[in-house]
């Protein structure tokens, strides 16, 4: 049960003839996973038996192979420090320390501290955050502390949440989102979603400086403790779609959004326990569970939304800001088909039955919608050119 190193001109067989050769290989659909993902006792990972990966050291090709499942503690394998930081993405590397192969975990997405591109190879990653406890049968149904699906004994299912390495955030070279956007979870074999409502990584600007027109510049992210971008920054559905496409992402359809949000508790009128939904709220707040609304840091005492998480570990599906989807419909409340000048200056026109005849669905609810917020909540009364201060989004992409 160990990593082994093969090297051109050193071992009996050259890398070119080693059976596993070919960039990387593994047995099955993945090679990196969380240990006992439904027990929640340990934050350890397993590198599966049969994994192999190539590395070019600037002179010759080398290959690492794994014989036997290799269990490791990411915190003990950090390049810096010995504790995993909450709300962060980590990357797993195979690195060469002299002639000894080892596993190194880092916040760096390029290569770990103490190594470079010729002595390390990124093979996967994970996110540290909140985790909803779910059934052990592979169906990912929320459970109470006795293991009953949607149960109310002990710790009721809505409150049965913990923290650690999010099991369905673990990715590798075989099992990964098409775009390594960061802050993502796997929803099913075909779909990955951002954990958080998207926020600004780079400020968004528009054609002619006019909100809602074509995006000139900007970049979004999925990150803990940030304010989600909305119409406050000038964005409508078209803009979210443009920004997503530029970064290799896309908007969710309504049915996909429901899959992401499944297992999120319904919002409440009188509290922010299950989402930023209290009817006295007056504005959006920062992303994430147990978040300090002022600093964006995790606050286990006064942080809001401690249980605002879905079965697949997406946060804020109920409340905070409505989330644009790509699903549209037609509004036939009036049927005077004509060219409608609604798309913005220099954007063309829309031939519709009325000036609001192309609704785009938004989901989840907003910051003061209370019990109207939930994992199927949908609003079909808004159109994609609408710039609204309480409309944000969540991004997705297909599996590689």
Protein language model features and the residues they cover:
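Short, low-complexity N-terminal tether/leader segments at secretion or assembly junctions of large
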Residues: 1-24, 130-132
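Glycine-rich, flexible loop motifs
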Residues: 21-86
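Cytochrome P450 core scaffold surrounding the K-helix E-X-X-R motif
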Residues: 204, 325-339
């Amino acid at each position: 049960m160990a990593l082994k190193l093969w090297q051109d001109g050193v071992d009996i067989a050259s890398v070119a003839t080693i059976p596993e050769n070919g960039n990387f290989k593994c047995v099955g659909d993945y090679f990196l996973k969380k240990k006992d993902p439904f027990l929640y006792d340990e934050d350890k990972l397993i590198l599966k038996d049969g994994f192999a990966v190539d590395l070019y050291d600037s002179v010759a090709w080398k290959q690492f192979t794994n014989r036997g499942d290799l269990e490791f503690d990411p915190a003990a394998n950090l390049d810096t420090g010995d504790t995993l930081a909450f709300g962060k993405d980590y990357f797993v590397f195979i690195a060469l320390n002299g002639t000894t192969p080892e596993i190194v975990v880092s916040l760096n997405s390029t290569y770990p501290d103490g190594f470079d591109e010729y002595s390390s190879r990124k093979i996967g990653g994970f996110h540290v955050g909140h985790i909803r406890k779910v059934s052990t049968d592979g169906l990912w149904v929320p459970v109470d502390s006795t293991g009953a699906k949607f149960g109310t004994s002990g710790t009721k299912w809505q409150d049965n949440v913990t923290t650690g390495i999010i099991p369905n955030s673990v990715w590798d070279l075989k099992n990964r989102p098409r775009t390594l956007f960061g802050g993502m979870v796997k929803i099913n074999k075909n779909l990955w979603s951002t954990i958080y409502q998207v926020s600004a990584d780079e400020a968004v600007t528009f054609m002619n400086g006019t909100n809602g027109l074509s995006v000139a510049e900007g970049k979004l992210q999925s990150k803990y403790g940030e304010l989600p971008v909305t119409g406050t920054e000038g964005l409508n559905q078209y803009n979210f779609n443009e920004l997503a496409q530029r970064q290799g992402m896309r908007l969710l359809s309504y049915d996909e959004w429901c899959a992401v949000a499944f297992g999120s508790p319904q919002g409440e009128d009188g509290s922010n326990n299950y989402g930023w939904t209290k009817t006295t709220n007056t504005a959006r707040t920062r992303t994430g569970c147990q978040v300090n609304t002022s600093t964006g840091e995790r606050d286990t005492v006064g942080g809001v939304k401690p249980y605002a998480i879905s079965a697949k570990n997406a946060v804020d599906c109920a409340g905070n800001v409505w989330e644009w989807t790509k699903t549209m419909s037609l509004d036939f409340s009036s049927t005077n088909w004509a060219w409608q000048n609604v798309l913005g200056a220099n954007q063309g026109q829309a031939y519709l039955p009325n000036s609001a005849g192309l609704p785009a669905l938004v989901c989840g609810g907003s910051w003061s919608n209370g019990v109207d917020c939930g994992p199927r909540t949908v609003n079909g009364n808004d159109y994609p050119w609408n710039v609204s201060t309480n409309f944000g989004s969540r991004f997705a992409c297909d599996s590689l």
